[in-house]
From Swiss-Prot:
Disordered: region residues: 1-42, 293-314, 360-387
Protein name per Swiss-Prot or TrEMBL: SWI/SNF complex subunit SWI3B
Gene3D superfamilies reported in the protein's UniProt record: Homeodomain-like, Winged helix-like DNA-binding domain superfamily/Winged helix DNA-binding domain
Quaternary assembly: Homodimers and heterodimers. Interacts with SWI3A, SWI3C, SWI3D, BSH, BRM and FCA (via C-terminus), and (via N-terminus) with HAB1. Interacts with MORC6 and SUVH9.
UniProt keyword annotations, A-Z: Activator, Chromatin regulator, Coiled coil, Developmental protein, DNA-binding, Nucleus, Transcription, Transcription regulation
UniProt KW Nucleotide-binding keyword: no
Organism: Arabidopsis thaliana
Classification of source organism: Eukaryota, Viridiplantae, Streptophyta, Embryophyta, Tracheophyta
Annotated Polar residues bias: 370-380
UniProt tissue specificity: Expressed in roots, stems, leaves, flowers and siliques.
Biased composition (Low complexity): 15-42
Amino acid sequence: MAMKAPDPGGSGEILPSTPSLSETTSGGAAAASKSAQLPSSSSDIDNIHVPSYSSWFSWTDINDCEVRSLPEFFDSRSSSKNPKFYLYLRNSIIKQYRDDHPRKISFTDVRRTLVSDVVSIRRVFDFLDSWGLINYNSSASAKPLKWEEKEAGKSAGDAASEPATTVKETAKRNCNGCKAICSIACFACDKYDLTLCARCYVRSNYRVGINSSEFKRVEISEESKPEWSDKEILLLLEAVMHYGDDWKKVASHVIGRTEKDCVSQFVKLPFGEQFVKESDSEDGLEMFDQIKDSDIPESEGIDKDGSSPNKRIKLTPLADASNPIMAQAAFLSALAGTNVAEAAARAAVRALSDVDYEADKNASRDPNRQDANAASSGETTRNESERAWADAKSLIEKEEHEVEGAIKETVEVEMKKIRDRIVHFEKLDLEMERSRKQLEEVRNLLFVDQLNIFFHTRKARKTEDRIEC
């Protein structure tokens, strides 16, 4: 909203100019009808832009929001702070700003020209600045308003005739106070287009004139978060390989994800359980590493004993394995456990030994049938190997299903505990912030009482000095 500078010789009332098309409030319509009745001023007066929500301002009257925001001038506790003195400070600051328009004024400039205590000047200056009555950026009027951004998909004619529609909530909401990402819940005010986190809402970290009852709590569901891309999963695995269980560094490596997101996604990975050091799988993983290192030629300059056990345990399955068959066998044995792998190996060796013994015995009895027995022994060996492999595979699959079920139940229980703890800590944080706010209010009241006592004592001393004189 653009307003004319006040006439020093007139009544001092703000003269609103013709509003632009972006003003849709009822105050803007009233200002337009009022400006149609008032005479047009000279063209050499600069236009001063103020926000539409500051249309309550008047040079001679005091609004209710001023009484609520600056109660020390209206509670009659101090003789030096009264409504008349407040009007003097407020109008002087606004006139000084309009005289130097479009240059912004600072608190130092105002303090040099006014005769009063620093606290009162500061309070009035911050109040006027928060409502945009001073130092309001004139270039901001050319920027699109929030309702214009919501209507960006419509044509200009539709935007002028139809009301703005609400947009879908984004998955991530940033706090307008501390600029942090709201995680579980946030507090939104549709009237002033504000979004605050729980900490800023408790601390009342919003501009003067907004009531806390105008905010509504908005739950941010976990399902609204975007799915993990392949690139983010690779970054997560890379961070876990480098930093281990230091989830702060892992979250900083995976940009745009929190520690809770990284932990939740990591336990959902199909091979996530192999990164945990379990007692029944350490031997199998070390066997896989020994087989992998033994197959690498020494000419590559790789020290087999140089790598730490932590790094060997964190290897991905079948990664850079020169012998894929042995690598797969070692990996399956690591998943199944040492007991199942040992039983399968013993059964395979026993079957091969029985086949070799029968073949040697038949060959010694009948040398003429040696070739035929060799062919049959090869076929028998293959059948026994396949049978042993099928038995071992069934045992491995059974053990794998049991392990996955146990891990899934354990992870669900732990995640439930973590969520309960997070909710509990958030409640404690809100209670602490509320207590701290009450303590600050008590301190402010104590400070005001001390100032009143000081002024009354000083006044009494002056009266006594006058009586003595």
